[in-house]
Amino acid sequence: MEAKLSPGTGIVILCAVSTAFAANHVAARIAFDHGGSVAAAIVTRAAGTALVLLLMMKLRSVSMTLPPALRGRLLLAGVLVAVQSYCLYSAVALIPAGLALLVFQTCPMLFVLLSWAMGKETPRPQAFAAMVLALVGLALALNITPDKFSAQWSVLGAGVIWAFGAAVSFAFVYYMNSHSLKSLDGRLRTFAMTAVTAVLVLAGGSMAGSLALPRDATGMIGLALLTVFYCVAMSSLFFVLPRLSAASTAALNFEPIAALILAWIFLGQTIAPLQILGAFVTVGAIAWLGVAKK
């Protein structure tokens, strides 16, 4: 039995993990701005993560046998992760990273709605309230008001659609992980999905001729860092989450806020004070939804 971490320590660690996830997206934007393609970034990140997870499992002597009944479901989950990865990185390439991640934060809401639709959970007024509050905050963060809708949508629309597509895809992955794939070791499950993602995007990118690497050293550093940050964050979760209380995991919702800060520092991406307020409202509402669910 692993020793539990105190709530304060857990929150600090998860905020650091969230910052690493956010840094991965900021580094990805640097790679994109210097000629790297979305497909190349996904293949690099997925392959690196799969290798790290494979090493972790070897060191811990984790069985790598996949039950035959779950192989098809794992393949489907891998396809969904590939779609999610492509959609989210495409969004990051088009709009500020923090805003892309805020739209992606609708994923927990979609997961709850899917669980309700499938009869796995009972609708609750508290959850409805959290969802409405999150959407209000998102509208503020995107600066989408009736008088500015057309102008803002012309600038942000494509990125918002990509990010929402990522949220939809990952909501189905969440659902599969919570139900049909729940019996698998988390490391093996993540390794399989990540490996499928790497193979699919590599094959698709090769056929489409869209595996362009960054054209200069700055872009290559961005490509390397996005892989490092993601691998560190993902592997850390497997060590930290088993030692935390359910309520502490709400700190993972810090990722969009961290992305806004990092993008401001390293990319010069700025948003208005009202948009920052909207970001905090959205993150707070999603955290509320998660804590209430647990």
Give the ranges of each region predicted by the language model.
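Juxtamembrane helix-loop boundary signature in multi-pass membrane transporters
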Residues: M1-A16, P108-V168, L274, F280-K294
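Membrane-interface helix-cap regions at the ends of transmembrane helices
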Residues: I30, H34, T49-P67, L135-W153, ...
